[in-house]
């Protein structure tokens, strides 16, 4: 009878183990369907780019598209043509010099100017300068989400700081956000992204996808995107992504993952 009990317990353990493996593999299988849905996300980006019209738009009357890709609300795209190849200096006015951003774009006739670092729920002043001509834009943005956690205390020695942005990602729920030296939100994603956010050598950001491949925190992979929110690449990993990655000198990525099939 004792042997029968041991055999019975052993069989029960094997059955439980097989069930756990089945559930794990089923989650991975379900993720294949979710990954296919990214195609529609990319199609959505292409559809939005149809609004990026340049014909007939000038420095005096540019095409201004707020949140051009639908997931980065404090950005805009300013589009216009010039008769000659011209440089454009863009200034996004802040509350002080450490929160004001200026950049000069290379000379061209067709100008697609990404605008980052707008304030939420404000008419932002953005100045375009082409030679001796200046155009002041007022770009209105929406309010921040009501469930966004905001800084309660900000201490900064501005004499030792520049006008950098400080990027933060949540470890569970929350928003991927960039703050300026005053603690004001100047950029955020509506996409749910976890773990690390870093800027690649080419200037793009690398963030997690918003889709879970396995509990408790394995995401399907990573998105490479620009600050406007345009996804330029997706890296899908059979073992998911969690916590950390690193860009190697040769441009390859070293990513923390797992092997769900090992069970």
How should these model regions be labeled?
Residues 64-79, 84-92, 112, 116, ...:
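Histidine-/acidic-rich catalytic cores in large beta-rich domains
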């Amino acid at each position: 009878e004792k042997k029968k009990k041991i055999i019975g317990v052993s069989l029960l353990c094997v059955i439980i183990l097989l069930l756990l493996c089945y559930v794990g593999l089923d989650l991975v299988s379900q993720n294949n369907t979710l990954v296919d849905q990214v195609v529609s996300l990319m199609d959505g980006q292409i559809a939005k780019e149809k609004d990026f019209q340049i014909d007939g738009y000038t420095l005096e009357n540019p095409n201004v598209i707020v949140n051009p890709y639908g997931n980065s609300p404090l950005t805009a795209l300013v589009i216009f043509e010039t008769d000659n190849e011209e440089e454009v200096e863009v200034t996004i006015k802040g509350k002080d010099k450490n929160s004001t951003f200026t950049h000069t774009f290379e000379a061209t006739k067709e100008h697609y100017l990404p605008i980052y670092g707008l304030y939420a729920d404000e008419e932002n002043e953005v100045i375009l300068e082409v030679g001796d001509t200046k155009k002041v834009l007022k770009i209105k943005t929406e309010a921040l989400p009501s469930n966004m956690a905001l800084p309660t205390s900000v201490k900064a020695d501005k004499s030792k700081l520049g006008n950098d942005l400080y990027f933060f990602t949540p470890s569970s729920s929350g928003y991927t956000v960039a703050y300026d030296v005053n603690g004001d939100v100047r950029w955020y994603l509506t996409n749910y992204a976890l773990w690390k956010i870093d800027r690649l050598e080419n200037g793009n950001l690398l963030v997690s996808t918003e889709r879970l491949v396995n509990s408790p925190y394995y995401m399907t992979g990573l998105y490479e995107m620009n600050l406007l929110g345009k996804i330029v690449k997706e890296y899908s990993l059979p073992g998911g992504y969690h916590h950390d990655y690193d860009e190697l000198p040769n441009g390859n990525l070293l990513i923390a993952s797992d092997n769900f099939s090992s069970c």
